[in-house]
Design a protein with these regions (language model features):
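Conserved alpha-helix/loop element of class I SAM-dependent methyltransferases that forms part
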Residues: 42, 50-75, 90
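Conserved SAM-binding loop of SAM-dependent methyltransferases across substrates and taxa
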Residues: 84-97
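Conserved SAM-binding motif I beta-strand of class I
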Residues: 99-104
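Conserved SAM/SAH-binding beta-strand->alpha-helix loop
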Residues: 106-108
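Conserved SAM-binding strand-loop segment of SAM-dependent methyltransferases
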Residues: 121-132
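A short acidic, Gly/Pro-enriched loop at the edge of an enzyme's catalytic core
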Residues: 136-145
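A short glycine-rich, Lys/Arg-flanked "PGG" loop and its adjoining helix->strand segment in the class I
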Residues: 160-172
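Conserved class I S-adenosyl-L-methionine
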Residues: 177-202, 215-229
């Protein structure tokens, strides 16, 4: 009996430990999201149409793989991390009977996008300030889910949530598009990113926009220096 009681205690301790670890991980992600949200408020990301995510491209690829995608005319479309909607506003214009929903952490970018949508008189697209982690089955199902420029920049818990959304919020014949960065193509851009991160280490007290401009100038200096080296080597 004592041994059994001890085993139960150990199991209970293990479960408690897992719960604590899960809570800590969740708190860490929430803190990260707060930092991300502030950065998105401070610096507006360029949002424009991305050809690979156009509905006709997604439907064509689905057909090539033997799938039976939903008709584009009345499709329900969700974009995660939509910024101010530059990628789906143009599609909402082209498919007036389809419905488009975009979500993003940034309230300022969502506000900007909705103002643009209202000025264009569009009624088939809505942008919502929302955390990806807060989406569940009650959010509805969609025929096309677009996740571009997010996967490679978020922690694992958000990646897991994206996959969950593509599982639970995708219609029976739905298509999900998830882009991600890979080597060797992204190695050079990663090097630029590392130069910028190194350059900003001593300037962390500066506002984000000022740090961004500062590090971009560092990149320009590096580029100019490399150009000088090339000219010297040619002589």
């Amino acid at each position: 009996m004592k041994q059994e009681s001890k085993q139960k205690k150990n199991v209970g301790t293990s479960v408690m430990g897992n719960d604590i670890e899960t809570t800590q991980n969740t708190m860490h992600v929430l803190d990260e999201n707060k930092v991300l949200k502030k950065s998105y408020e401070d610096v507006v990301y360029i949002s424009q149409p991305f050809g690979a995510t156009s509905l006709n491209t997604l439907a064509a690829r689905a057909l090539l793989f033997g799938l039976n995608p939903v008709s584009l005319k009345k499709a329900r479309v969700l974009e995660l991390g939509c910024s101010f909607g530059g990628n789906i506003i143009s599609q909402a214009l082209y498919y007036p009977e389809a419905s488009f929903t975009g979500i993003d952490l940034s309230s300022s970018q969502i506000k900007m996008g909705n103002e643009l949508i209202a000025s264009m008189g569009l009624t088939n697209i809505h942008l919502i300030e929302k955390d990806i982690l807060d989406i569940d089955e009650s959010f509805g199902t969609f025929d096309y889910i677009i996740v571009h420029g997010i996967w490679s920049w978020v922690p694992d818990v958000v990646k897991d949530k994206i996959l969950s959304i593509c599982n639970k919020n995708l219609s029976d014949n739905g298509v999900a598009y998830v882009s991600y960065n890979t080597y060797p193509g992204w190695k050079r851009l990663e090097q630029y990113r590392e130069i910028m991160q190194y350059a900003e280490q001593k300037e962390l007290e500066m506002p984000l926009m000022e740090r961004t401009l500062y590090t971009k100038n560092i990149l320009k200096l590096v580029a100019d220096t490399m150009g000088l080296d090339n000219r010297i080597s040619q002589k």
